[in-house]
């Protein structure tokens, strides 16, 4: 099997539990790129956070963010693919979340929009510097054009309840994916990491059989199934492990370095 592109989820995969890139992972990524292999991030995070870590690692191709809804060139800052909600859908969605007093954030380009700022609701972003967060208060409707993703944050164990409620209201007008157990990512319909990865592969003229995809969570299932070599972290959920062709070490044990050294 010849691997030409490695796609890495961030939280629980590329990053350890401290939300940092272990040195061994960084060195293994450099070795892979030195061999002419493309290495990218495929994350549910917003573009700015994905780009922040990709630039730290000098990654050599566009990155996939917003669970596949955005594929952005690091050098030009331009999107080679971007999916948006319809204005009607996102307006209705934000309105319902406001009425329910659910804490939400939504992304337009590299900007995060919130009703009010509460950094306790951003635990995954604690190691990303320079985030642009805009507090909009009650006047959200002027910030509903070109929205790529909305995230519901709930630290009280009610994410599944919220997901079921929104699925009942919106049906196939949105995509719903639990991410970390305390957040839920909402995307335009039909979007997942496999979609974003396929757009990147097409851009790079690489066949899916030449892709290695690594992840740990619910939102990684599609790309792990799509890639020629699907890799689960030892800390992955069972659903991911069950479809992966290989299980690597835990994210706190340099699992990405281990799998790169094994297959590259």
Name these PLM-found stretches.
Residues 36-40, 60-61, 149, 209-210, ...:
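Short active-site oxyanion
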Residues 4-18:
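Asp-based phosphoryl-transfer active-site loop
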Residues 21-37, 82-89, 130-137, 190-202, ...:
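Short, acidic loop-to-helix structural element flanking the phosphoryl-transfer center
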Residues 32, 43, 67, 150, ...:
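Residue-level signal for inorganic ion chemistry
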Residues 1-5, 21-22, 185-264:
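Mg2+-dependent phosphoryl-transfer enzymes with acidic/Ser/Thr/Gly-rich catalytic loops
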Residues 96, 100-214, 218, 235:
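Conserved acidic, metal-coordinating active-site core of Asp-based
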Residues 18-121:
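Active-site phosphate-binding/coordination module
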Residues 57-59, 66-67, 169-172, 226-227, ...:
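Short, structured coil segments at secondary-structure junctions
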């Amino acid at each position: 099997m010849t691997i030409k592109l490695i796609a890495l989820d961030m939280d629980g995969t590329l990053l350890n539990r401290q939300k940092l890139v272990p040195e061994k992972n960084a060195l293994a990524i450099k070795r892979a790129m030195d061999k002419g292999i493309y290495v990218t991030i495929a994350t549910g995070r917003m573009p700015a956070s994905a780009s922040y870590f990709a630039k730290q690692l000098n990654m050599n191709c566009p990155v996939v963010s917003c669970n596949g809804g955005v594929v952005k060139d690091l050098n030009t800052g331009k999107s080679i693919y971007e999916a948006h909600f319809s204005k009607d859908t996102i307006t209705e969605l934000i309105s319902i979340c406001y009425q329910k007093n659910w804490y939400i954030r939504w992304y337009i380009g590299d900007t995060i929009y919130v009703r009010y700022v509460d950094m306790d609701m951003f635990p995954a972003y604690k190691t990303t510097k320079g985030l642009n967060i805009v507090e909009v208060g009650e006047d959200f409707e002027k910030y509903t054009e070109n929205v790529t993703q909305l995230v519901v944050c709930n630290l009280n164990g009610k994410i599944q309840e919220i997901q079921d409620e929104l699925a009942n209201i919106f049906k196939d007008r949105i995509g719903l994916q639990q991410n970390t157990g305390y957040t839920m990512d909402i995307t335009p319909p039909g979007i997942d990491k496999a979609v974003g990865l396929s757009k990147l592969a097409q851009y790079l003229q690489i066949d899916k059989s030449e892709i290695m995809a690594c992840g740990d969570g619910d939102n990684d299932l599609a790309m792990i199934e799509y890639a020629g070599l699907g890799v689960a972290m030892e800390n992955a959920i069972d659903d991911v492990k069950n479809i992966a062709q290989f299980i690597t070490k835990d994210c706190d044990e340099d699992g990405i370095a281990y799998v790169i050294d094994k297959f590259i």
